[in-house]
Amino acid sequence: MHFHLPKPLHGWRAFTGEVGIIVLGVLIALGFGQIVELWQWHQNVATARQEMANELAGAADQGAERVAIEACLRDRIGELVAKLNASNGRWTADAMPSPPGANHSMARVYGAPLRGWSTDSWDTAKSTGVLDHMQHQEVAAYSAAFGEIAAIRDFQNEELPLESKLSFLGAEQQLDNSSRIGALEALGQLDTLNATISGLSDLLINQVQNLHLRVDRSSSAKGLQAMIDQQREFRGRCVKDVQVQF
């Protein structure tokens, strides 16, 4: 039995040409789709890069603030330790003035600034797949910087309960030995945390500066200076000037 293939209406040459046109059209459509997808990822990367730059610039300023007040916090710890060691059972209230915007009902005897240390832009970049479309070295640099931010935030969270634990020293009282030892232990931990956070902040500043971020340098410098001025008004001349060069 013989089978005869149906012949195209206009011949095989015309049919082949029509098929070629269809295939070419499909390839063009696929290529255009890939171009659109690449362009979209390019836009997503640019947006993510700017969001991370803005967040890192803010974190670097917060780090500079911690470096600026490191000596103030260290001196305050030393004052309280010396007073506790010299205590003969009677404690004289030694509260700090309330910082701007404070809403505590109890006086504080020690206080570091509470900052956000946000990593939202980095978390978003990881979850959306944007990092897969960036160079490995750049991603590694961002990862290191945001890792420092997360570490500083964790250490800051350790400071808060220790600060609260010392609030009782803001009132005059008869101080028993157990309370005195407990306060000294808390101050020892705060001393370590202060040095650690300041060291990590200094490292963060260097990492951020090496990224050569595209940010509003003038606005960032003004914001940092405002923070330092506020700290100096609150803590005095122990606050040193620190700059971040983007």
Q: What function would you assign to each model-found segment?
A:
Residues E18-F32:
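Hydrophobic membrane-insertion alpha-helices, especially the h-region
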